[in-house]
Swiss-Prot record:
Gene field: nadD
Name of protein: Probable nicotinate-nucleotide adenylyltransferase
Family of this protein: Belongs to the NadD family.
EC number: 2.7.7.18
Lineage: Bacteria, Pseudomonadati, Spirochaetota, Spirochaetia, Spirochaetales
Protein purpose: Catalyzes the reversible adenylation of nicotinate mononucleotide (NaMN) to nicotinic acid adenine dinucleotide (NaAD).
Gene3D superfamilies recorded: HUPs
GO molecular function: ATP binding; nicotinate-nucleotide adenylyltransferase activity
Recorded metabolic or biological pathway in which this protein acts: Cofactor biosynthesis; NAD(+) biosynthesis; deamido-NAD(+) from nicotinate D-ribonucleotide: step 1/1
Amino acid sequence: MRIAILGGTYNPVHIGHIFLAKEIEYLLNIDRVIFIPTCNPAHKLIDENVSVSNRIDMLKLALENEDKMFIDDCDIINGGITYTVDTISCVKKKYKNDKLFLIIGDDLFQNFDSWKDPQSIVSSIELVVAHRIYKERLKSSFKHIYIDNKIIPISSSEIRNRIVNGLPVSYLLPFGVLKYIKDNNLYVKKVNV
């Protein structure tokens, strides 16, 4: 089986994530896309008002009608700071006989040499770079594949900011995720009284 790995905070998961997963299915002839929510990513802070449980619930809602997309909670179970090299080690144990592809955006790829043990990553899995912010391909000495995907110019941080400022986000999120955010008052300004 050909399996693509998409790690991220998914805070919140949005249509850009789902669209990229669909593009990956098509462009790389992928049988399964596995979303791996990070516990505490090494490269960013997570809003403490949104729990790991909230992020996983939103992912479940976003993927409920997708038959090739699944969630793996290996990073959550391991806890602590999440490093991709450790995630890959965990995933390779579960999918020993499968061809694995790690998908990262070019925004992360531009600093790939600063990741923990990047050479080990590219030696153990196919690294696939998706366009996220750059139209041209970035050069690197690390072995990788570039895909010519459509760029959907949205981000989770932009969605959080729009919610805080009362701006519409309904077409940026799967409906179930939008409803979950509203029902749980996520990302809204907290007023101290």
